[in-house]
Amino acid sequence: MLKLLNLTEDEHDQFVESHPHGDLLQLTDWAQSKHLTGWYSRRFAVGNEAGETLGVALLLFKKVPKLNHTLCYISRGFVCDYHDPLLVEFMLKEALNIARDEKAYAIKIDPDLPLETHRDTIEFLESIGFRHRGLKDGMSKDNIQPRQTMVASIDKDDKALLQSFERNNRTKVRNAIRRGTRVYRAEREDLKTFVTLMKETGQRDGFLTRDITYFESLYDNLHDNGHMELFLVKLMPTEVAASLEVDMEKVERDLEKAMKKKDGSKKENQIKDLSNRKEKLGKQQQEIEEISKRHPEGVILSGALLAQAGHKAYYLYGASSDQYREYLPNHHMQYEMMKYARDNGARTYDFGGVSVSPPEDSPHFGLWQFKKVWGTQVSEKVGEFDYVIHRPFYTLAEVGVPMFQKGKVKLNQTLKALKERR
């Protein structure tokens, strides 16, 4: 016999963090962070007669502009065993009660269920009234959350973790560590620096960025509960200079030894290689000397927001400077964040959405190339489902409004083009 339970926020979060289908987006502090963007939440829990919790759901609601209705979005929920049909149906019934009370035109869910083990769940959810929105590409704008993400297993020691990366990426990580960047956990006031980097990244890669209030809301709500950290990477000129000096001394010693060898092609080639190496190091020393003059205290090159819910870590947002990219700050940062997440109980590290194996001319190709070299596997989920409560409003909100918005964008583009011709 199933029944509703009255859980505290802590009890709800503990269940989410311990459940295999739990997710960051079902935590109560995540819901609180969404208040800034107009969402509010309600939640419920289901258990057995003994009072054991079997499932929970956090429901987000947002009012639809111009309509006296809301959308109910259970992001990465329900959190329960989907192979227990009675439990899922009971949870749907309660979700419908709450959704109708909030005048929702539909309930949208996108549970954290691997497609590989839950293909039958798609048919089951359709049989109880849900509409499956299809197995969309991971970068599709038709889904709120990406259906396909890249996830790395990180429950291993440092050596094994590094070894799990693709060969070329291992080399880049080692080089990044040697080149004098320092990765550290930053404080709330450093969000200003992060947002500046984010704007720079958005301009470079052609996407719109959020203002600082959004990131402050995330940090303020999730950080104190151990669900979020801000990381920054700083180039330390003095450390780089010291490292280059050691390298230069070694090259000069090797060059001196090579000069004393018997003449021959082998000697000539070795001297040539060492001379080229010495010249390159000399240029690097000059460059770092200039950097040191401009930034004597160091310069921030990149940053990221790392989130965690139980055994799952998430690379939420990343940003980097256009300057000094040859120091590979992102590679050093990712490695350190993976180690930090592991040391704090995470077993997996989610790099976020991708388009799987896109063609080279795809705008998503670079993202795929970056995310696939970290020992990651594609995590393919069952996708997004809608339960329609009020069909006319659903059709208007899900079809009519997007069509109107697209038409408005096209009209603005046309008017802009005509204006430019004058």
What are these model-derived regions, one by one?
Residues 75, 213-216, 336, 401-402:
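Juxtamembrane/interface motifs at transmembrane-helix termini
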Residues 24-25, 108, 231, 350, ...:
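Short, hydrophobic secondary-structure boundary micro-motifs
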Residues 6-9, 19, 32, 61, ...:
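Active-site/acyl-donor-binding loops of N-acyltransferases
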Residues 4, 37-41, 92-94, 108-115, ...:
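Low-complexity, flexible helical/coil segments
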Residues 67-142, 253, 308-374:
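Acyl-donor binding region in acyl/amide transferases
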